[in-house]
Amino acid sequence: MFRVSGNQISITAGDTALMAICPDETGYVPTANDRAIFTVRERPKRRTLIEKTIAPEADGRFVVCFESEDTARLKPREYVWDVRLAIQANVDENGEVTDAEQIITPCPPGILFVMAAIGELSGAANNGFGQPVNQTLRIRFEKLMQGPRGEPGRDGAKG
């Protein structure tokens, strides 16, 4: 089972799923040089359990791929997640962000509910990534625009 409702994500331990994080039509549309960093932790400021650095699709959306191993080892309970946008990011050879022009958090942190899997699978299962995105989370990305002295920039007021 996989479901997204507001900032709450529910997934069965060991399942695979795709979730699109889409820019709001009126906000900033990510470019090829931007990256989203999706992170799941036990609680805020605790150890990272899942971290994915994602390049945007051509339309500006980011697709988070939940692999089976991402959630299979997690105990059934609540975790916290957030997504941060690295604008004009520099990445290393592993695709991890090393520096960025700006880092923004476009939405409040959310809750990830991991539920216990009742049945067992025999053999390899199709991970379903050939399928369309299961759920969509629409977020307004706001890029900080300002002039050299901090005045409002041509694309909007200072954050």
Feature annotation, model-predicted:
Residues 1-126:
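N-terminal assembly/attachment segments of tailed bacteriophage virion structural proteins
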Residues 122-159:
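Collagen/collagen-like triple-helix sequence repeat recognition
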